[in-house]
A protein has these predicted regions:
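Alpha/beta-hydrolase fold nucleophile elbow
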Residues: 139-152, 172
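A conserved short beta-strand
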Residues: 75, 167-179
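Short glycine-enriched nucleophile-adjacent loop
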Residues: 65, 155-166
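Serine-hydrolase catalytic machinery in alpha/beta-hydrolase-like enzymes
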Residues: 43-126, 130, 134, 138
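A domain-start/cap signature at the N-terminus of enzymes
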Residues: 1-46
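Catalytic active-site module of serine/aspartate enzymes centered on a nucleophile-bearing elbow/loop
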Residues: 275-285
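Histidine-bearing beta->alpha loop at or near hydrolase active sites
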Residues: 263-269
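The feature captures the conserved acid-bearing segment of alpha/beta-hydrolase catalytic domains
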Residues: 176, 180-262
Length: 285
């Protein structure tokens, strides 16, 4: 798609590096940027940033982009990914998308060689301080209408941004967020925000999408043996069933324009692609 474009949208690619202070290394990222072919409105285009940009872009059809180009407010779509050809870079996203927590809060599944967590604050600063300004230099963007989409761990990141730096975006779209991660740590961030500064999120827009089909059945493989899978399911029990819906209701009561939609019959993994048309259409209204 990024090579061919679609009627109504053209693509360009931006490259980025950022310094990871924890490891004293440079990390590379890229954004496949889909820009409406229509003239930009005076205030600039809305901008929607997608985490796991490689995976998200693989799920977007030319027909969907053409439909979007004809909407009331066609957005610029920024597919942000680690600079490789992996659909999902599991280790890189685990670090970039998760908040810093005490290691004791991590499940056995999460505590595995080569996987680190806790880089979300630095990654959010990278997005707001470097990625968005570079996009704005490339095409006119409306700073009052920016959005962030993320799935699973990416959903944690979206909520972390809302709960800790709500002015980063106007529209937040977490898809099947892994609320169980870190023994429900993200819910403690929500609690702190609502207790200390609920006015900070008043009038923000939140669209939460979840699946109803649960986890697709998995066979043990490689490092995901039966014991590891058991740890996964145990970790998910750290957050009561229905907590996502209750979180949405709490945020709605605090003044957030919050809604939740269930994608019927879809497993956690299937919600990634299925959520995109719904989110795009809501954002472009």
């Amino acid at each position: 798609m990024a090579d061919t474009g679609a009627p109504g949208y053209r693509f360009t690619r931006l490259q980025f590096t950022r310094h990871d202070a924890k490891h004293d290394t440079q990390k590379a990222y890229r954004v496949n940027l889909a820009i409406p072919e229509t003239p930009a409105p005076e205030e600039g285009f809305p901008l929607l940033i997608m985490l796991d940009g490689n995976a998200a872009l693989m799920e977007v059809s030319a027909d969907l982009l053409t439909e979007l180009s004809q909407s009331a407010a066609p957005p610029v779509l920024a597919f942000l990914a680690h600079d490789n050809d992996l659909r999902i870079d599991g280790d890189a996203r685990a670090y970039d998308y998760t908040p810093a927590v005490n290691e004791s809060a991590l499940s056995a599944k999460e505590q595995r060689p080569g996987r680190e967590y806790g880089g979300a604050d630095g990654y959010l600063s990278f997005i707001t301080g470097k990625v968005i300004p570079a996009i704005s230099d490339n095409t006119p963007v409306n700073p009052e209408k920016t959005g962030l989409w993320g799935h699973s761990y990416g959903g944690i990141f979206v909520l972390h941004a809302l709960f800790t730096r709500p002015d980063s975006f106007a529209f937040y779209a977490p898809v099947d967020p892994s609320l169980w991660w870190g023994e429900g740590y993200i819910l403690s961030e929500e609690h702190d925000l609502l207790a200390e500064s609920p006015a900070d999120i008043k009038d923000k827009s939140l669209l939460v999408l979840t699946g109803s089909g649960g986890e697709a059945k998995r066979r043990p493989r490689g490092d995901r043996d039966a014991a590891t899978l058991a740890a996964v399911y145990k970790a998910r029990e750290s957050v009561p069933a229905g907590e996502t819906a209750r979180m949405v209701e709490r945020l709605k009561a605090a003044g957030v324009d919050a809604q939740m939609t269930t994608l019927q019959g879809l497993s956690h993994g299937e919600t990634l692609g299925a959520s995109l048309p719904y989110v795009f259409r809501q954002f472009a209204r």
